[in-house]
Amino acid sequence: LNKQGKLGALFIDYLNLINIVVSKNQLQETTDLALGSIARKTKLMAEEMEIPVILLAQLNREVDRRQGLHFPVLSDLRNSGAIEQVADVVIFVYRAEKYNIFYDPKTKEDLRGVGLLLLAKNRNGATGIAKFRYNPAMTCLTDYDPRVI
């Protein structure tokens, strides 16, 4: 990977698309173990190459069944608790509009075009939330400014 020079970062879109060959009767357990192994190997590769590896992964459907604002949590990572254990940082991208929620029930803030980056895990620092603006017509994220609607 470094033949043309040092990589700045590696993006994998996404973990659950990596083909895993297993028998039908061992599918769930083997898939979980295989995805966990891939997550661990990805982390080792990041350390060896001294680059950040951004590994995208799907969430399970529990987040859709949750009441309220449907905020994802670490246990929502699909098919692999190992992702949660291995990752240095886990960030969820969240938009209330996806769940047909257009106003914050507590603050009454207009959530149309607003998204959140939920820093759910940060091995070397604090966790928290950062807001952003989302323009679906341009598939564009920008800094959040409360004066812009």
Give the positions of each predicted feature.
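Short acidic, glycine-rich surface-loop motifs adjacent to enzyme active sites
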Residues: 10-18
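Structural recognition of the conserved hydrophobic beta-strand(s) that form the central parallel beta-sheet
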Residues: 11-12, 51-58
